[in-house]
Amino acid sequence: MRDAQNNHRVALALPDNEQLQKTPPMDNTIKGLLDREEIRNLRTLYAHHLDSNNIAALDQIFSTDAVVEVTVGKMEGVDAIRAGMDDAFKLFDRDRRSSYPFIHAIANHWVKLTGPDTAEGRCYLIDFETASKPDPNPLLLLGLYADEYRRIDGEWRITRTRLEVVWPERNGASEQPANEAKDA
């Protein structure tokens, strides 16, 4: 009986340093999953920062030289992106609540790692208006973001994004991903 108890204790013991040193480094599959999750989080944080009027935090999402093409126009560089998003926020904040005049819901986000520090992806956008307006329908638009990402100084950033609106009116959305159609 005593031997069984001792064997049980040994089985629960923590590994020693020699055993830990034999543990292989992080598997590439796990690293890829962690990279994809960090990248997906960029788009979620973008929606949160924009909707809550935390425009200053967009430098945590975009590279300094990022290019953004959305319904309010094309912006190049993080300062232009902040200015453009600030103008869009003011335009939709008709009730002057200073937060959440719209809510960006992000869904179906896929990410493809194209290199050790580059990736591309797409996700759906369901954009709701929460500010008062004559039309009681809160749905503003449906669209798809096509993004390019790069790891800069150890942090993932969006380097290029294009919003394809598919409803209420299409703005050039096609079956070809915007990632591939950017030079067309």
Describe every region a protein language model picked out.
Residues 55-125:
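A solvent-exposed, acidic/Ser-Thr-rich amphipathic alpha-helical stretch
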